[in-house]
Amino acid sequence: MNYAECLELARGKMGNYCKVCPECNGRACKNQMPGPGAKGIGDTAIRNYDKWKDIRVQMDTLVEKRPIDTSLSLFGKNFQYPFFAGPVGAVNMHYGDSLNDVSYNDILVSSCAEFGIAAFTGDGMDSNVMVAATEAIKKAGGLGIPTVKPWNVAMIREKMALVKDAGAFAAAMDIDAAGLPFLKNFNPPAGSKSVEELREIVKAAGVPFIVKGIMTVKGALKAKEAGAAAIVVSNHGGRVLDQCPATAEVLEEIAEAVDGSMKIFVDGGIRSGTDVFKALALGADAVIIARPFVTAVYGGGREGVEAYIQKIGSELADTMAMCGVSSLAEITRDCVRV
């Protein structure tokens, strides 16, 4: 199975919200929520995609021919590629009821672990979303990253107990989910967190903690102050606020400010191995891709996930070879033209 075949099969299994576009660029679903779209007109998701395409790679084949090494070491784990599947919760509501969170997470987490990467998993209003996610990670020997919504600190502590029971090697919180409509009137109050609250959450996790939803240098430095091991430069896939800059536009300045003191992930509109290369050149340590993994699972299950990982991985390796680098460490700023 290749990814194109996977997309064709997914069209018959997904609901009305996701259009299963050949190129997932945010245009067809831009204002649909529930679904993969945004609460506004969706221009941030579209900008995310477009800005990666504005960056060009610097081809250089006057180099010694060497084996290409795409491997990444992160938090004591070794991965075949520097990209991860992104967190998605309540899949039956957003993408169609041929799968639920239990079946989706079982396929995604186990397949990612089998084929050399790891999956971030989602959270939701239904507490069973997080339960299903952490159970899938436990079955995979802890090779997954459970991602909690920014609930109140007491509720997050309860969810961190699930993380510990799963043996997850890291945990995350998508702080930008504060902009999701269903969190606005949640009781007890959920949403944005102070540095002090974040520090308490980081301590409760007991494993390397990743703060997802950082779009400014100021935000990155506050996450560092709170003790985060990593950040994700992210605007929640453009879902939570229109008129934001693209992640590609802010990544480099954030990476320069962090200066290696935390690991940096980036997401938002990354749709090829060449995009992954660009992100690493601008200072990211790794990349997160979400929506295309959903269609991979719906369209092909385990084989679909394998096909998508191989697609992105082979594109990355080819770009590295054509740009004269043989390891991730060699992908530097001069490899791209912005």
What spans do the regions from the language model cover?
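An N-cap/entry alpha-helix motif that binds or orients negatively charged groups
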Residues: 2-80, 331
